[in-house]
């Protein structure tokens, strides 16, 4: 009992430091939305600065503490002003998180250069004799730790609730834009939050230093512990952070006391992953959600490899192959090892670029898959005599299984939470490698045999060179094929807008699992070859710090460019290996480069080259602007020149919308026997939905007949778009059901609903801005392609045939909507009307049975609206069932067969346009009771 009490007291002391870290995390996140991965650096930095003031300047401990507060606070304030402030509103949360990781690495590198690798500690503030209560032994320094934590949290709580600055911080955390409009100095609030977090870190470092030793490696350790604590308790909750920190300290102490200290972190990480999977906001945190029908901010560009002529590719490939063939004779023997290590990391980085750069799934634990592959093959070879090739395959299979689990866990997570999961995964693998006997613990595994195939050993630098770089070339070719394929487009669409991609039929979890598996297998192969090349493997070689280095390599070369990150690998791998002086600065340089590229050069080196090439081609072509209006469709619609003007008012040919000879719509194919004119296609029965106690939709019911054009109208705030979100299951209804062609679809995933033939557009044009206009439409036809990842990576004949057919259909649809001349431009440059037409074309690409158009005329002038009306009629006339939410009454009354009117979340009228226009209840809803009685 007394032993357990001492363990718990030790856990509370350590947990108090974790609580201070977690509160700092929570404060910065609440105000700025940034997950400050440099928080742990403030603890070690504060203690190290104090040590310098006490030992070099001979200041008293109190004066040294105040001086440390000033130095660290000023440094953090300067960094916030120069780097972070504008990044908060200009880059995505995921990029911001990676940038904060770069700051942590920069702090580590600076601390290493200033204080070296030797750990430092202080004497206890009040002696070394513990206080004993019965058999409980409490270190006197523990009272300082717990007291400092309680006092800091109490003062912070008082300031947040009672002071003017506290009110400003709380207002900014609730709504940054609204706070700015109301005169709150938001930039100062962000600065204040970072300085306050730094102060909390310095306080923690000052009181914990007498109990433990601190050095530059402590920064990452405390960052990880604080992140676990705040994720457990709840981001944005001071008291949740306090509870999470104390609980984490106690759990780790109990595991260390009764199991092993080597497993305390691993068990905490497993708990963290489980909690984030079940409740991402933490145990006491609250959901910081937004509207699911409004796209999130995405930073940077998403590139597809340029489609070069085959002769160029063949000539370039042959030239490169010849150069690589003779490179071992050119490169000095001492540098071959550096070149081979560069190649091994290139193999990992190609997979990481697919995962993070192309698919947008930020992975801060990629080295974990290298560790799984390396340790699996090493253990099998050393302990059981298994051939290294079999070990490599086993490692890849093991990594694939872990990637499946990780992909499923991450399937429901986005942005920051996904990054936390992958970071926790990388740290977990490192912790297990350090703690398990079979891995050799911190000492690692030695005596690993060289990689061999059928008795041929790759036991020299030259042989390994050819093996590694052939694998890199194969990985690049397969990845480039995949990115240009149907699957690759959907991965890029998922990166641009996950909810938008899901609304087009993408199974998010399945897509994430697929790309995680591909990326993991590449990293695992690299890890296996890495272990056999060095004949040795230890946890620090494939630890979590290496994962952040991979992210830096990616950022330098250019995320999503495939070839660009190889430049980053060469810079950060080759130079430190051939230059010892550069190696001493590698951490600092790595961190600074990651911050600079993510903040100021998000396209990276190769991305900048592609930007320049694109700009030069555009200017050289002298392309003129196109109106973006739909052209008259007829026999010549497909071949019309891009700049040709079209007389407005001509009816779009129905044949162009159905694309002759390509089968029936998805909805018709999904229906049992198809529908017939006038039969109910879509039935909404008693739908209700409330948000925070406010009823947005109340008992809404209506029926849409097959082949009809129905409008859903009503004043602003009537609940029309919410009904669309309920029908497509972006929101789960509180009650009621939706019937599609006689089948209940309430509760089905959005991708399942689209597979049944129901597609939608959004109130705010939700195109994929970083994709080309043509690719946007092709994404809409994602389900028309049947080939899988492997077939499309190999570009089999059936894949090429599918691609040709889909592209032909997409170009015909673009011609119908007047966008054929802009097919290769980014969708972001289209005017609002052009983006609305692009959404219509994308929805029709999949041959839907039912289409929901949410305010398609928004932002259009009268001529464009008239043309839109003709398009809507043409879509209906081809057999599609159309439902529109629209405020333009001239358009609604001129083209619709049925009008459903909503007000205050209820249906108040339904019928023909003529009947609705004369309904007193409708007139009252729009113009008031007095007008209705006249």
Predicted regions mapped to residue ranges:
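Hydrophobic alpha-helical segments within and immediately flanking transmembrane helices
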Residues: 14-27, 35-55, 75, 79, ...
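Transmembrane alpha-helices
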Residues: 15-25, 180, 184-208, 220, ...
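Conserved N-terminal flank of the Walker A/P-loop in ABC nucleotide-binding domains
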Residues: 23, 180, 350, 499-502, ...
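Short, non-helical or kinked segments that cap or interrupt transmembrane helices
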Residues: 25-47, 61, 90-95, 165-168, ...
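Glycine-rich phosphate-binding loops of nucleotide-dependent enzymes
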Residues: 34-37, 170, 175, 675-683, ...
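Transmembrane alpha-helices and adjacent helix-loop boundaries
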Residues: 94-118, 134, 187, 262-264, ...
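Membrane-helix/interface signature in polytopic inner-membrane proteins
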Residues: 156-194, 219, 477-515, 822-824
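ABC-family P-loop ATPase nucleotide-binding domain
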Residues: 295-299, 303, 610-688, 930-934
